[in-house]
Regions:
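Long, charged N-terminal interaction/targeting segments
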Residues: 1-61
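Long, charge-rich boundary regions
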Residues: 2, 20, 106-124
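Short loop/turn motifs enriched for small/polar and acidic residues
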Residues: 32-36, 66-70, 109-111
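Short, conserved loop-to-beta-strand elements that form functional interface hotspots
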Residues: 58-68, 91-94
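Short, flexible, mixed-charge glycine/proline-rich loop motifs
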Residues: 62-69, 79-85
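Cys/His-enriched microdomains
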Residues: 72, 88, 106
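Short cysteine-rich clusters marking metal-coordination/redox-active sites
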Residues: 74-77, 90-93
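Short functional micro-motifs and their immediate structural scaffolds
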Residues: 82, 95-99
């Protein structure tokens, strides 16, 4: 299960960004995940819940996953098509000379911080 390693990497990245921006708590992390990335979302969510609970910045933080559809382009006819539906062979011209345009990526799209109450200025 490589999802745990992926979650650890996401958490390290989020914690680094939080420190750079003086954020003390994270509410939500939105991840864009390619349809053919090889990551199983349910495993990713289970690993996230376990690992986030152990982080000082992330207890209770939600991981939202947006799926990026896999799209392939044919080098012979130039047509684009849905990868999962048609595979590696172009449905337009039956050419095997195709390559994946999108759908393999994994990107942190958004980090939502918990707003902290501003401290009142001290009175003299």
């Amino acid at each position: 299960m490589h999802e745990l390693g992926i979650v650890f990497h996401i958490i390290r990245t989020v914690e680094d960004v939080a420190r750079q921006n003086d954020v003390t708590r994270i509410r939500r992390v939105t991840l864009q995940l390619g349809e053919v990335s090889g990551v199983v979302e349910s495993y990713l969510q289970d690993c996230w819940k376990w690992a986030a609970a152990k982080s000082k910045l992330l207890p209770g933080a939600v991981l939202t996953v947006e799926t990026i559809p896999a799209v392939t382009v044919c080098e012979d006819c130039g047509q684009q098509y849905p990868t999962v539906q048609f595979g590696r062979t172009c449905p337009h011209c039956q050419s095997p000379r195709t390559h994946l345009l999108q759908g393999h990526e994994m990107l942190i799209k958004e980090i939502e911080a918990v707003e902290t109450e501003p401290t009142a200025p001290e009175r003299a």
